[in-house]
A protein has these predicted regions:
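Charge-rich, low-complexity amphipathic helices
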Residues: 37, 59-61, 92, 96, ...
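General beta-strand structural signal in soluble alpha/beta enzymes
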Residues: 45-49, 83-85, 111-113
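Short, acidic/small-residue loops that bind anionic groups at enzyme active sites
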Residues: 98-113
């Protein structure tokens, strides 16, 4: 089994919204508070384009856009770990849009969400 590296001091946390984003309250304010906490701990943040989107029905954007965002941010060297910024009830809708072949050959990273 491959184990990802832990989040380094002053590392970068990537945020994605493969399901519900943070476009409405109380999620918007809670996400802003989480960002303040992480930056206060010295971490940099990289927010995906769907984090504040509300273009879908119960999902931040289209399944295609959400799958592409998750693939891009997981495979990116610009962040050390990934966190889903919102809910995950409709994440199953994006699974066939995620490029698992590309993810499989990428350096592993922690993903929570």
């Amino acid at each position: 089994m491959k184990y990802p590296e832990f989040l380094p001091e002053n590392g970068t946390i990537g945020f994605v919204a493969p399901s519900f984003g943070c476009s409405i309250e109380p999620y918007h304010t809670a996400f802003l508070n989480a960002q303040k906490k992480f930056t206060g701990l010295g971490h940099r943040l990289e927010l995906g384009p769907n984090c504040y989107a509300s273009e879908g029905i119960g999902i931040s954007s289209t399944p295609e856009a959400c799958g592409a965002e998750l693939t891009e941010y997981y495979c990116s060297d610009k962040n050390d770990i990934l966190i889903s910024c919102g809910g995950g009830e409709l994440m199953c809708e994006i699974l066939d849009k995620v490029d698992f072949d590309r993810i499989r050959v990428t350096k592993p990273k922690w993903y929570m969400g």
